[in-house]
Each structure stands twice: as structure tokens, then as C-alpha cells.
Amino acid sequence: KKKGIPAVPCLPVIYAENPITAGNEKIMAKEMDLSGYPYVLEQAEEVEEAYLEKIRCRLLGLPCEILQTKRCIVREICLADVDNLYEIYADPSITLYMEGLYAKKEEEIAYTRDYIRYQYGIYDFGMWIIEDGQSGEVIGRAGLDLRPDREDAELGYMIRKNRQGQGLAYEVCTAILAYAKEELGFEKLFARTRKENLASVMLLKKLGFHPVCAQSETKEADNAQIEYYIALS
């Protein structure tokens, strides 16, 4: 509290057949309501500095840093990023192959607030912000999304217009693939792009993705998406 960190319930728990209490510890019976405790660890060894730092950021409403590359920082989105995203998405080329933002900024802010709370809070991953490692400028987004009908996650990426063609998407996505395997435990990922989006197609192939099938979203063949997958072996 002295450092501005909100207080949250904390209770050491030990499992036993018969529920008793001893000092500050709770001996856990077969059933126990833990709904008031936002973080539950099964082993004391799981309490590592990096994990505690992530909890600190969550409680203070700060974006957690996910990873760094040679030129970029990948971190969670925060509400302060919304204005930067509207500036980036104002270029028509950005929304040529992907969905745009809400027309009303207050709706985008509300969506972002819920995304931070539920997507990051529950799954611990999602679409992240890409920052220039030197200037701190927001230069794009990249990350992993879940689909209701899929167990594997979808890789997504976007680099602002004036920073495209510099190899940044490849640099960041390569690091995200490693993170997905080593930190999140994914065995494979998929990605979708339109066949006429040649830059995206080339990026996926360079990353090691393989085409699966064409999936038409509309009756026009030019709007068909190609699905790619990669095994994280």
C-alpha cells in the first residue's frame, strides 16, 4: 500500500481432508471458495519475480512488457494507446485487409478496457502494442488471438505505414513465435491473410507458415482468405 499498490486478499493454502485453521494459514478441505482471490498458485516455487511484477502491473493498471527485440518492445495495450491507434488506422492502407477501430472513440476505449481486464487477465496473452525501442513511438500491433472454434491461437500483426518495409514485422513475429512456444506452451499457430496481400503472404512464408486452404468470406474470389499454419517444434 505504501508504494501505491492496492491491497488484495492473500491466503496460504494447504490441502487436507479435514478443514482446520492454524495461524495465518488455511488448511483446505475438498471444497473451498477461492472466488475472492484473483491469483491462485499451486506451488510456492511458482512465485517468481517476473510473475510478481506482472501482478504488480495488473493491480496498478500498467501494461506488462512481454518481450524485447533488437529494435522493438512488445507490451500490453493501455488506454493511453487508443489515440495513437486512431492515428495509425487513419491511413486507408491499414484497414484495406483488416478490421478497423470503432467509429466512436469512447466505444474503442470501453472495448480496450474490457480487453485488458478479461483477455490479458484471464489468458495472459492477446494482441499487443509494438513500440520503437529507442523513441517509444507506437509503431504497430502484433500478438495472438483465440477463436471460439479453435484450440490453437491466431497470429496477427500490423505495422504503421511509415515503418513498413524495414523488417519490423518479421523481427517481432519471430520473437512472438518463440514466446508462444516457450512461455505459453502452444504447439502450433495459424494465420489468415488475403491472397492479394502479398507482403503478408511473403511474411508468413518467411516465418515458416504453410498454406492450408482458401476460405471465402464473400462471393467475390478476390476477397478469399488463405489460412496458414506453423508447427512450433
Predicted features and spans:
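Acyl-donor (CoA/ACP) binding surface of acyl/acetyltransferases
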Residues: K2, A7-C10, N18-D83, E87-L96, ...
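Major-groove DNA-recognition helix of helix-turn-helix-type DNA-binding domains
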Residues: V13
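Hydrophobic residues in alpha-helical segments
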Residues: Y89, M98, Q119-G121
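Conserved GNAT-fold acetyl-CoA-binding loop/helix
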Residues: S93-Y115, F125-G126
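Generic hydrophobic, helix-prone segments enriched in Leu/Val/Ile
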Residues: E107, I116-Y120, P148
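A short helix-loop-beta-strand connector motif used in the catalytic cores of GNAT acetyltransferases and
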Residues: Y115-I129, G140
